[in-house]
């Protein structure tokens, strides 16, 4: 059975020539949405998908704008709004050491270098220079941890465990 990974969500159309506006859920939009790449657009129920090829990609504000082969006007892409864009596991490329896919990080437990459990990574934000990991704590508000070398000391994907250094003001 194929394992699928969410790489974006179609939130709207853009213009009249069939562009779709995508909120990306991938660290590598320039690779993922490269012209000629195959993507799979899943219906909102998650039961069926369309196979499409990317014919153009550009970034606009915080969105990725795509056009797809065979979809040439706004009426043809209107029905895709709300759909998820997914790729099968075999389309995931190898990463360099110290790089991780979102699905590998989300769900990891986070502990301090002293061994104190802080919570579980529930989301990854990409606001600018570096990613920010959102940690759901057992009690209280979520904790935001910057993904920088000074803070994230060790990531153990096999054991789903991240060890961090608590800098002053972080907690």
From Swiss-Prot:
Gene3D superfamilies for the chain: PRC-barrel domain (2.30.30.240), RimM (2.40.30.60)
GO molecular function annotations of the record: ribosome binding
Keywords: Chaperone, Cytoplasm, Ribosome biogenesis, rRNA processing
Coiled coil: none
Domain PRC barrel: 96-170
Subunit structure as annotated in this protein's UniProt entry: Binds ribosomal protein uS19.
Function text: An accessory protein needed during the final step in the assembly of 30S ribosomal subunit, possibly for assembly of the head region. Essential for efficient processing of 16S rRNA. May be needed both before and after RbfA during the maturation of 16S rRNA. It has affinity for free ribosomal 30S subunits but not for 70S ribosomes.
Entry remark concerning the domains of this protein: The PRC barrel domain binds ribosomal protein uS19.
Protein's name in the database: Ribosome maturation factor RimM
